[in-house]
Every structure is written in structure tokens, then in C-alpha cells.
Amino acid sequence: LMNLATNERIVPIISIEKNIWGDLTCKRENSDNYGPHGIDLIKRNDGRYQLGVISHYPNETVEMFELLKENDAWKFYWMGCVNVPDNLYFNDISLKKDGSFYATHMYDREITMNKWLITSLLKSNSGYLVKWENNSFSKVPNSDGSGPNGIVLEEDKNIIYISYNQG
């Protein structure tokens, strides 16, 4: 977090709670580190604030936190995670108010540097948009593109904006 009025960086306290927002097979310990990438914050249908974080370490996961301000300090309560299937490599996330989410799958995890360069130069399709709901991932039809990266969901209009950074 950063307070833009003071340019102060705020390192929140993280407490591990029961996994109620993720996949029950996904586990996290207090001692586990995070490898954060794309993030999104929404006010859920139940009025709580949910932060979704793509994490590349120690495993490929999507981490879910509740944000609360207590005694003038921000606290993150870990509320669950979702294991990312081995065939997917996520970049960004956009949450829905019901706790489900969309994520961009940029390219195969095992892509070689040569294949990545060729894909980038030719702007070939390398990934697509994925939706997670009811503890299951599904590919969003017609979302293939070259290097899908950042996304923003406008849920009330049922529109998602996708940045294909290689074309």
C-alpha cells in the first residue's frame, strides 16, 4: 500500500485465517513467502473488501485477502487461495463481486526463449482469458491473443478490457 498524500509506503500485517474464499485444496502457512504480480480490489456483495493477488512463489496461486483498517493501521486477512493448474501461467486478475474472478494466461509456463521471441515478433496467439467460479477454471471463448496482460472488469456492464501486450 502507499499513501499518495504522504508518499508513505505501508507494509500491512498479514494474518492467516480459514480458507473460505478460495479452493480448499490450496494451503498457506504463516512462514510462506509471496511472489505477487497482478492485483485487484473489489467491494464484495457482502460488503467486505477483497484483494486478489496473482502469486508466482512458492507455487502458482491466486491469493485472496480481506482488507480492514483497524486502529489506523491496514491489516490483510488471508482468506484463501486457488492453485493455478500446471498448464496456465497468470499475469493479472479481475475480481467479481461474488468472489469469482478472471485472469490472463499469458503463455505456457515452460515456453522457451526462442519460442517467446518468435511469438512476440509475429504477434502470434500465446494465451487467453480464464474464468474461475465454483472451484473450476474455464477458458473464455474468443479471448485468444498475443501476450494477454492487464485486465479490468466492468461487472455491471458485463465488459472486460484486455491488454494484449504483444499485439
Give the location of each predicted region.
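Blade-loop segments of beta-propeller domains
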Residues: L1-N45
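Surface loop/turn motifs at the tips and blade-to-blade linkers of beta-strand repeat domains
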Residues: P12-I16, R28-S31, C81-D86, V140-G145
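Beta-rich catalytic cores
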Residues: G35, P58, Y89, N125, ...
